[in-house]
From Swiss-Prot:
Pfam families, alphabetized: DUF525
Listed InterPro entries: ApaG_domain, ApaG_sf, Uncharacterised_ApaG
Coiled-coil ranges (or none): none
GO biological process terms, semicolon-separated: error-free translesion synthesis
HAMAP family, A to Z: ApaG
Protein known as: Protein ApaG
NCBIfam families hit by this protein: PRK05461.1
Species of the source: Thiobacillus denitrificans (strain ATCC 25259 / T1)
Sequence ranges assigned to domain ApaG in this UniProt record: 3-127
Length: 127
């Protein structure tokens, strides 16, 4: 069996601009994002840590690393999903996030689940 199929995690993202928590006059733009992590591989895997790269429109980069997500290190058996919501604050109305989750499969193999780049944007800023 191909390694790629054995250890395969799909990640999808939904984002929202939080106007009530943002203050554009103070260069504070707050976004929520909901991540769905799905194990489409053939072995169970546990999310151990995360690594985010957050870039605003001025190319200011923040890197965030830490254990788990929202205080959890979920174990995903084949076919299972885990969903969580979190947020990010930027100094510009548009930015991007991308990164990876560090996973450990039940057989002890360690691998990264890549989080594809996604856009955070205040409504009516992007055309």
């Amino acid at each position: 069996m191909a390694e790629g199929k054995k250890y395969q995690i799909n990640i999808s993202v939904n984002t929202a601009y939080l106007a009530e928590q943002s203050d554009p006059s103070a260069d504070r733009y707050v976004f929520a994002y909901t991540i769905t992590i799905e194990n489409v591989g053939t072995v169970a895997a546990q999310l151990i840590s995360r690594h985010w790269v957050i870039t605003d429109a001025d190319d200011v980069v923040q890197e965030v690393k830490g254990l788990g997500v929202v205080g959890e290190q979920p174990l995903l058996r084949p076919g299972e999903t885990f969903e969580y919501s979190s947020g990010a604050a930027l100094a510009t109305p548009v930015g991007t996030m991308q990164g990876s989750y560090q996973m450990v499969a039940e057989d002890g193999n360690k691998f990264d689940a890549e989080i594809p780049r996604f856009t955070l944007a205040m409504p009516r800023v992007l055309h």
